[in-house]
Every structure is written in structure tokens, then in C-alpha cells.
From Swiss-Prot:
GO terms for biological process: translation. InterPro entries: Ribosomal_bL34, Ribosomal_bL34_CS. Belongs to the bacterial ribosomal protein bL34 family. It comes from the Bacteria. Residues 1-44 are annotated as: Disordered. Residues 9-23, 30-44 have a biased composition (Basic residues). The gene is rpmH. GO terms for molecular function: structural constituent of ribosome. Pfam families: Ribosomal_L34. The lineage of its organism: Bacteria, Bacillati, Bacillota, Clostridia, Eubacteriales. PANTHER family: LARGE RIBOSOMAL SUBUNIT PROTEIN BL34M, MITOCHONDRIAL RIBOSOMAL PROTEIN 34 FAMILY MEMBER. This is Large ribosomal subunit protein bL34.
Length: 44
């Protein structure tokens, strides 16, 4: 049995990237919350 996490940058960006987040209202809310919290990194 192999490990479940096989990192790939492209898949990571496509699922959790900035542009994907900006597409939906809930995604924009995530970014807004992270900005308010003062996160240095907003998305993957």
C-alpha cells in the first residue's frame, strides 16, 4: 500500500490556489478571513 499524499504542485494550485478561491463566494470569504487574521500566505 502506498502513501495517500503524493504531492503535485499543479493539482495543489488547481484545488487550493488563489484563482480557484476567487471563483466562488465562499472561497472569497476564506481569503477575506485569512486577510483579517493577518496570514502571510493566503492560499497554497
Amino acid at each position: 500500500m502506498k502513501m495517500t499524499y503524493q504531492p503535485k504542485n499543479r493539482q495543489r494550485k488547481k484545488e487550493h490556489g488563489f484563482r480557484k478561491r476567487m471563483r466562488t463566494l465562499s472561497g472569497r470569504n476564506i481569503i477575506k478571513r485569512r486577510r483579517q487574521k493577518g496570514r502571510k500566505k493566503l492560499t497554497a
